[in-house]
């Protein structure tokens, strides 16, 4: 493939920029070749969409302050799934680099087959557990997802653990035996749950992931839900966990937790001390389906792995417990409650004189149209990305497309969003791009916390009538940021809005690279769109 002069010039500019910032931070370079490949993580062979031919995709890592340069090469050819692609770096704020955020038709046009795009962004003040995934239709459900970790050499919790590396990342994924678009409007229960790269469908005895621990060390595990649909009850038989991070933000250590309910796109770091009798212990991820908050699936799609002590004398401990026997499944005594997590730092106060700073998003499902709505409107991708519309001089919510799905926000204000419960198909994990937010009121809680609530980027909404979720954040990051349900099938059915933050300031704050300008003309001239 011939490289355009703009592409070459862009690469040289980026390399010069990277050299200029190297004194302040490092440079993390990665190439992701997006390919089709037949894999069988649960014993069933199917074609998939993968980064570098593996699932999950390769770990991308760096340190706080680093610049990340990630070249995405689209080598897809299987028309039974999406062949265009984008990649979103989930949880990264993207200050000054809204163009690199990734959601198709919000911040960019998709990358078509046989073309590449170089994402370039700096992470100056974030550290923690993130991930990356396709943000084109339901493509990430077909396998395009992987871990992204930003380490902090000055981590305030570093005295609590001894090991934190690629062996302590635990990913949870739902896996389907059919291409994701065939499951729409869906979703349907997954055929299996994968812990890292392996799963067992229908209660089989196929191999599972084994995670080894040395009883003389303490481990920081980074738990990532890469799911498209279910949420999970995660636990490790016989072991408690100390939570120290949620969605890339440190929390006050919360100890003695024996179960974590984790929703799609959420992440937690927990410290585990292997202080039990040496042996093997089941790691469990029991999926819960939509509308079912009390009965996890402990049989057909139960996710399993093994925590193995390196000084064990045998394998009897795990083998003697039937993981599918409910009578042998440990009952949680102290499960994690979101409202018990507390962040560091000050919660921003409301701007009482700001009429545009308090929003309510009413979610609903239209059974006739078979779509989701936010305040009565179902989101449909515009033909021109919202960022490009803004850079071309369109600033008002009345003018920006898609109509009635774009909300403009003033700059440097505190925004409070209320999301009532009782939503069909919930709970719904709502993710806001470009920001972390304080969860003033959590799902299922009748109390508010404006002192030290958890700071995160994905929060569950659902519950009963009258059950509100309230979040709060500062508008310090001009650009269009999509807010959507992270059940990917629901996003495909219109469960989203765009928050256009200080649109009149975007041109000064965001400067896309030349190859970004080429994406839409290439997309428009592609012979077909899939």
From Swiss-Prot:
Protein name: Laccase-2
Pfam families the record matches: Cu-oxidase, Cu-oxidase_2, Cu-oxidase_3
Lineage, top ranks: Eukaryota, Fungi, Dikarya, Basidiomycota, Agaricomycotina
Positions annotated with a glycan in the UniProt record: 82, 120, 191, 240, 292, 311, 366, 375, 392, 412
GO cellular component, one term: extracellular region
Signal sequence interval, chain numbering: 1-23
Organism from which the protein derives: Fomitopsis schrenkii
Compartment(s) where it occurs, according to its Swiss-Prot or TrEMBL record: Secreted
Gene that this sequence comes from: LCC2
Residues involved in Cu cation 1 binding: 88, 431
Induction conditions: Expressed during growth on spruce wood (at protein level).
